[in-house]
A protein has these predicted regions:
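Bacterial N-terminal signal peptides
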Residues: 7-17
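A phosphate-binding catalytic loop at a beta-strand-loop-alpha-helix junction
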Residues: 131-142
């Protein structure tokens, strides 16, 4: 688990350092002019019922998210995440999408965080808003979305499990196992 998380954090750091270096030199113009798709958004996975999950999108990828018909974004990452965008709320709302930030500490997720997420999802789903849920790498987003889709929407475990969550389950630490074990009564 530690090796996997360290590898993931190192990969994200390299990705964003290289991207920042390219932006400084102006070499991203050629990259940005190439056609990107939702598949280019880190760990993107479209779920059922107008819900998708992802890792941290780049500023330019939020336009792709809008073009993919998502009208709301929920960010579960903390502001101190290595790849966080300090102006993400403005980027998203400037594209006429709604933005909700529910910072969930990686090492201390709680039932209260899940409850706030459920309430936000209920509000957005009541408005028939397709929602993209993201965090730094799609781990938090996958767990919270899984809980919502199984407990609130009645989807099967198979339908609600992202490929990333399936891979992570055997390595998950006790904090996240506790979140996975929550019942609806524990959350409400």
């Amino acid at each position: 688990m530690k090796f996997s998380m360290l590898s993931l954090l190192l990969a994200m750091l390299i990705y964003f350092c290289v991207g920042h270096s390219l932006a400084q030199t102006g070499l991203t113009d050629d990259v940005d002019s190439q056609s990107e798709s939702m598949a280019d958004v880190m760990n993107y996975f479209p779920m059922t019922n107008g819900v998708g999950t992802a890792g941290q999108p780049t500023p330019a990828q939020f336009a792709l998210i809008k073009a993919a018909k998502y009208s709301a974004v929920i960010n579960l990452a903390v502001a101190q995440s290595v790849n966080a965008l300090p102006n993400e709320a403005k980027i998203v709302t400037d594209l006429d999408m709604s933005y909700q930030h529910i910072p969930v500490p990686w090492d201390a997720p709680t039932a209260s965080h899940v409850k706030e997420f459920f309430e936000t999802m209920d509000m957005l789903r009541h408005q028939a808003s397709p929602v993209l849920v993201h965090c730094a790498a799609n781990y938090r987003a996958s767990v919270f979305t899984y809980k919502y889709l199984t407990l609130r929407q009645g989807l099967s475990k198979e339908e609600a499990t992202t490929p990333l969550l399936k891979e992570w389950l055997p390595q998950m630490d006790d904090n996240w196992k506790a979140i996975m074990a929550l019942s609806l009564n524990d959350i409400e």
